[in-house]
């Protein structure tokens, strides 16, 4: 076995040495014949007036990025070139049936096709792949390239936007009389191709759907030259996939905007209304900072999402102002603010019914009692005045000794009235007069007894008041003062509750107003985007074989 090993190694070595000699000698001979006297700098025409027809195609492999801020579209493409070179024609029978030959592209003439709207990087293809030579003289060269083309971004409907970008290719050196450009799928004299970009090897983007890829040929005349310069526009219409922005921007923004409505549902006594408003305002500001990092810095248009955020910030700002006004109404006191009759009529009687609010029965009872008390007070004052006049007339008409005795008693009681009147002055009774004025008491409450019993409403006391001793009359005045003070305090508390209820009605009123404004504003702004009503199906899922293999379900035959 060991003796047989060297002959086997020798045989293997001979086979390896014989393998290069087994290469296609016809292809080598063809390569030498075609390129031995070939000049790659000369345009491949037999006559100098002839035009080289270059057919151009674009095969999209991947949509790498669309930078909205820098307005740059980055794509991974294969740029297909096809033209005729009369020097590369041969008879396959003379070269062992060879019909195609792969040669390095650096060894042959290449059209200087560049990307006119280049934004960054190389204008031309930098990866020099091999070209395919056909025996008919046709040359096919399909190099890969990564282009960064400028794309004008329209941010009006962001994030429900559609963008149309283009890639303009043309010869940088030769005019239209030397090199004529046409699309590789162009037929007859039609300069437009509906599907101008090959999407068979396209990897679907996670952010954009491709709606259309038309191509169109143009001829442009420059001031320097009389000849036309042809170019081909490859247009790409993109529609944004909105799931990411809906979940991460739209939904939180809508939720925060509706929190501004709940500010008016929060009771004023909680003390957190202003804090909630400021927190919502700060959240809206944070969203503005996030969007400013995404959208391009342009003053030509305001993004749709920016409009909505601005709308919500206006609502939140108004809610802060209105909340301050509502709190001011809630904490008003009768000692500083007297409620106007129209306020009581509008905000306690009318608006609660329209706003579906239940008015407390105590407020309704207080309103009714105040109306009855007002009418009764006016009638009692009139009756008391009439009784006082009658008593004065009867006392003046009396001429009996008893009348004279009562007259002297009346003078004695009048002196006591003067003493009581002295108590009402600022120097008397430690400021009782000032306390009475604070709670709305009149001088009659401490003046003559007719006015005091006039408030009590008892007409019999008017006739018999002269029989009261001074101590009893003073006690009656003190009791009436305490009664008047307690009545004023009850009215003070009742009106304080009225201000609180008015603030509650204002909260409910603006709750409805802001709810309707938020709903209408949300739908009016966000539903403005035309992409929401566009039911055009993406063509990348239909034309891409890669997408069909990845996303379409397997079909068992």
From Swiss-Prot:
InterPro entries assigned to the protein according to its UniProt record, in alphabetical order: Neur_chan_lig-bd (IPR006202), Neur_chan_lig-bd_sf (IPR036734), Neur_channel (IPR006201), Neuro-gated_channel_TM_sf (IPR036719), Neuro_actylchol_rec (IPR038050), Neurotrans-gated_channel_TM (IPR006029), Neurotransmitter_ion_chnl_CS (IPR018000), Nicotinic_acetylcholine_rcpt (IPR002394)
Keywords: Cell membrane, Disulfide bond, Glycoprotein, Ion channel, Ion transport, Ligand-gated ion channel, Membrane, Postsynaptic cell membrane, Receptor, Signal, Synapse, Transmembrane, Transmembrane helix, Transport
Side Cytoplasmic, residues: 330-500
Signal peptide: 1-23
Cited PROSITE patterns: NEUROTR_ION_CHANNEL (PS00236)
Membrane topology: Multi-pass membrane protein
Name of the protein: Acetylcholine receptor subunit alpha-L1
Family note: Belongs to the ligand-gated ion channel (TC 1.A.9) family. Acetylcholine receptor (TC 1.A.9.1) subfamily.
A GO-annotated cellular component: postsynaptic membrane
Localization in the cell: Postsynaptic cell membrane; Cell membrane
Disulfides per UniProt: 151-165, 224-225
Function statement: After binding acetylcholine, the AChR responds by an extensive change in conformation that affects all subunits and leads to opening of an ion-conducting channel across the plasma membrane.
UniProt cross-references to Pfam families, sorted A to Z: Neur_chan_LBD, Neur_chan_memb
Sequence intervals crossing the membrane: 245-266, 274-294, 308-329, 501-523
GO molecular function: acetylcholine-gated monoatomic cation-selective channel activity; transmembrane signaling receptor activity
Residue spans, topological domain Extracellular: 24-244
Glycan attachment residues as annotated in the record: 47, 235
């Amino acid at each position: 076995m060991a003796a047989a090993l060297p002959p086997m190694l020798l045989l293997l070595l001979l086979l390896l040495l014989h393998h290069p000699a087994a290469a296609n000698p016809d292809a080598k001979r063809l390569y030498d014949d075609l390129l031995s006297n070939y000049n790659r700098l000369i345009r491949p025409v037999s006559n100098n007036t002839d035009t080289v027809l270059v057919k151009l195609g674009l095969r999209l492999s991947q949509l790498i990025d669309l930078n909205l801020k820098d307005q740059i579209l980055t794509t991974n493409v294969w740029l297909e070139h096809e033209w005729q070179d009369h020097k590369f024609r041969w008879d396959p029978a003379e070269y062992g049936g060879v019909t195609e030959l792969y040669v390095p592209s650096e060894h042959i003439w290449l059209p200087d096709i560049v990307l006119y709207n280049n934004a960054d990087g190389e204008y031309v293809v930098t990866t020099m792949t091999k070209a395919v030579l056909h025996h008919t003289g046709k040359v096919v060269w399909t190099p890969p390239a990564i282009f960064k083309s400028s794309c004008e971004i329209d941010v009006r409907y962001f994030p429900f936007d559609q963008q149309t970008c283009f890639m303009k290719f043309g010869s940088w050196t030769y005019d239209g009389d030397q090199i004529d450009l046409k699309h590789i799928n162009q037929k007859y004299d039609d300069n437009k191709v509906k599907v101008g970009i090959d999407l068979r090897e396209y990897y679907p983007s996670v952010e954009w759907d491709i709606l259309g890829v038309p191509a169109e040929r143009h001829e442009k005349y420059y001031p320097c030259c009389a000849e036309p310069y042809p170019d081909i526009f490859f247009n790409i219409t993109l529609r944004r996939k909105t799931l990411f922005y809906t979940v991460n921007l739209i939904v939180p923004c809508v939720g925060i905007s509706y929190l501004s409505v709940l500010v008016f549902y929060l009771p004023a006594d909680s003390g957190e209304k202003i804090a909630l408003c400021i927190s919502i305002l700060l959240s809206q500001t944070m969203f503005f900072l996030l969007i400013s990092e995404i959208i391009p810095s342009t003053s030509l248009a305001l993004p749709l999402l920016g409009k909505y955020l601005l709308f919500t910030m206006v609502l939140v700002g108004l809610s802060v102002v209105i909340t301050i006004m509502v709190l001011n109404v809630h904490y008003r006191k009768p000692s500083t603010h007297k409620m106007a009759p129209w306020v009581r009529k509008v905000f306690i009687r009318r608006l609660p019914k329209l706003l579906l609010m239940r008015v407390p029965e105590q407020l309704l009872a207080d309103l009714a009692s105040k109306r009855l008390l007002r009418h009764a007070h006016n009638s009692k004052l009139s009756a008391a005045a009439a009784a006082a006049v009658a008593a004065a007339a009867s006392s003046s008409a009396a001429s009996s000794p008893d009348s004279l005795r009562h007259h002297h008693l009346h003078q004695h009681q009048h002196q006591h009235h003067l003493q009581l009147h002295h108590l009402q002055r600022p120097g008397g009774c430690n400021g009782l007069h000032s306390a009475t004025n604070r709670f709305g008491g009149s001088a009659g409450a401490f003046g003559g007894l007719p006015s005091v019993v006039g408030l009590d409403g008892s007409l019999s006391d008017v006739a018999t008041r002269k029989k009261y001793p001074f101590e009893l009359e003073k006690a009656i005045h003190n009791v009436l003062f305490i009664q008047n003070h307690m009545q004023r305090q009850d009215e003070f508390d009742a009106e304080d509750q009225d201000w609180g209820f008015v603030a509650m009605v204002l909260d409910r009123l603006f709750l409805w107003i802001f709810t309707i404004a938020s709903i209408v504003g949300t739908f009016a702004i966000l539903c403005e985007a035309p992409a929401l009503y566009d039911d055009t199906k993406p063509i990348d899922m239909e034309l891409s074989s890669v997408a069909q293999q990845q996303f379409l379900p397997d079909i068992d035959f």
